[in-house]
Every structure is written in C-alpha cells, then in structure tokens.
Amino acid sequence: SHNEDKILKSLDKETFSKNVVYVSDAGMPCVSDPGATLVDYCIKNEIPYDVLPGANAILTAYAMSGFSTTTFSFYGFLDHKGVSRASKLDDILNDDKLSILYESPHRLLKLLEELSIKDPNRTIFLAKEITKLHQNSYKDTSLNLFNKFKDINIKGEWVVVIKPKETIGFNLDLNDIQNLDIAPKIKAKLIAKMTGQSIKDVYQKLLEN
C-alpha cells in the first residue's frame, strides 16, 4: 500500500540491523492485512526474516465449517458495490472449490441478500468474532440465513464460507441447464429437481428472464 511504501522509504537498512518485530492487533499480517510490502522489501534487500504462525480466521473457519472439501479459494473482502462486486460474486458461486471471504457487519446482510437472490439453496457457513468472547457460528442455506439475520445482532467481524457449486452428471451445472435449447417447462422441472425449488417458481423466473 501507499502507506507501507512511505514508511519503508523513511527507514534505512541500519534499522534492520536490530531485531524488528511486525505484528497486527487483529488477524495475521499479509492476510487481508498490511505486511506483504515489508516481506518483499526484506527479500529484495537480503534482510533475514521469519514468519511465526498466528491467529488465522480463514483456516479456523474452514475447520469449523464441516465442509468435507479439501481445497478452497480465499477472496478477502469484496468490493463494496459496482460491476466488480457482482462479477466476483458470480465467480464465487461458480467456483468448484469452497469459497472463503471476510465481511464487515455493515455489509453482511447485503451479501446474504445477494447470495439468496442468486442461489437461495446454496449452503453457507458464517463465523462471527472467531476466538473472541462473542464468537458464534451459523450454517444454513443463503435464503434461510438472510431471513434469520434480519432480526439478530450481527455486530462483529465475519468469515463467510460458501459451499462449491453443485454439478450433476458430466459436470452439468445450473448454467448449462439454463442455456439448453429446450422448452421452459422442461428446464423448470430439471432446475427444480436440482435445487429443491418449486417448479412453478422456477418457471416464473425463467419467463421473467
């Protein structure tokens, strides 16, 4: 970041002839927190350094989630709005790996609403304030979580773990079904079977699109 570069430029190599410790007051440096610029500086200037494992919400939430998949993608914090946010959400919902991201309490309900519209039956795991006094977790479909979270206290920092997209047959997914050149009623039956939604609701959505 600009601030990291500015601080490093104000230092000389003599600074690093002493034992220097860089810590974060919450989370782990370099993981959605500053720190990577300092590590790169040390590498380029041949300054010996070490990294000690610390609190990591990603791995803790992964272990807590109960999902059996062994691979995941980490998306950090999403953009607040705009095309880039919508595009990233599509990437997440089409990812064949578990998706993990961070979200603030101010935008969590918005995220759940977006997910519930795009894929109401996708299973989501939410972890709040991991390792802290008010730690809590929830696991349900995106639609159920959105409805639940309208009425509860969502203060605190959140980790969101999203189940990979489901495929059927020869890696056939919902987008493949929607793109088939078949009657909407048949599409509706196939999608309803895959997602658990009612045929009537799916058919209506297909007509609207």
What do these predicted regions represent?
Residues 1-5, 55-56, 76-81, 129-132:
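Short, acidic/turn-prone active-site loops that include or flank metal/cofactor-
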Residues 1-50, 59-60:
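Class I S-adenosyl-L-methionine
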Residues 9-15, 87-93, 137-146:
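Short, surface-exposed amphipathic charged segments that create phosphate/polyanion-binding patches used
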Residues 13-15, 38-39, 65-70, 118-119, ...:
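Short, hinge-like loop/turn segments at secondary-structure boundaries
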Residues 18-19, 98, 102-209:
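A contiguous loop/helix-start segment that scaffolds small-molecule binding in enzyme catalytic cores
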Residues 21-25, 71, 75, 125-128:
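Short beta-strands and strand-loop turn motifs
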Residues 24, 51-54, 101, 126:
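General beta-strand structural signal in soluble alpha/beta enzymes
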Residues 37-95:
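Class I SAM-dependent methyltransferase SAM-binding "motif I" and its flanking Rossmann-like core
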